[in-house]
Amino acid sequence: MAGHSQFKNIMHRKGKQDAQRSKAFSKLAREITVAAKLGTPDPAMNPRLRAAVIAARQENMPKDNIERAIKKAIGGDSENYDEIRYEGYGPGGVAVIVEALTDNRNRAASDIRSYFTKSGGNLGETGSVSFMFDRTGVIEYDAGKASADDMLDAAIEAGADDVLSSEGGHEVFASQETFRDVAKALEAKFGEPRKAALIWKPQNTVAVDDETGEKLFKLMEHLNEHDDVQNVYANFEVSDALMAKMAG
């Protein structure tokens, strides 16, 4: 399991305090508004907006909040956010991609550069590490939604590239070009997924020792806590022992 997936699992197990929950809702609302502003305000016709709405539902964001974020885009009274991708190397030379929506480029760049530097890494230029990742669609379902064989058969029939099934659920991967069609076909068969989004999937992962792993998780925690940061991806793996320690 790639480091960013391990990190998200740890954060989920730890649960969210009210302040963290509020920050999560704020980030989700920002993504919903931007997605609705860039495309149609109808989630059925706007894959990015649909992905954002699904993510919001998974976080138990109130329906009123979701609708308000969409209406904000329609009304034209929303702030203007720039979409920026930051790339760099974290501790141990691990490649890291940060996706942000910001209304202040200088502030965001300064903050994110500081996080990388303090962790022992360095922020690079756009394109410096993204060649080590694939821009891929992922559709996730809970394990109880289908057997591994049924999910695999349905995914292949829909045109997916790969399927990973475990006790934690099913992950279906599809190219950018086929993502929307695959997601639509699976939803017709299994219902709404718990996640459907475009991600940066590492082509290969690097196993790091526990000391480096802790530094990387700390870097990712700082990045994720920043108001402008939407997603963080990295190409590392850590031991099960460190996973258990960080989740404890």
From Swiss-Prot:
Cited HAMAP family: Transcrip_reg_TACO1 (MF_00693)
Family: Belongs to the TACO1 family.
Chain segments carrying region Disordered: 1-22
Keyword Cytoplasm among record annotations: yes
Main location: cytoplasm
A GO term from the CC aspect: cytosol
Gene Ontology BP term (one): regulation of DNA-templated transcription
Location in the cell: Cytoplasm
An annotated Gene Ontology molecular function: DNA binding
UniProt superkingdom: Bacteria
Name of the featured protein: Probable transcriptional regulatory protein RPD_4171
InterPro entries, sorted: Integrase-like_N, TACO1_YebC-like_2nd/3rd_dom, TACO1_YebC_N, Transcrip_reg_TACO1-like, Transcrip_reg_TACO1-like_dom3, YebC-like
Keyword Chaperone: no
Assigned keywords, A-Z: Cytoplasm, DNA-binding, Transcription, Transcription regulation
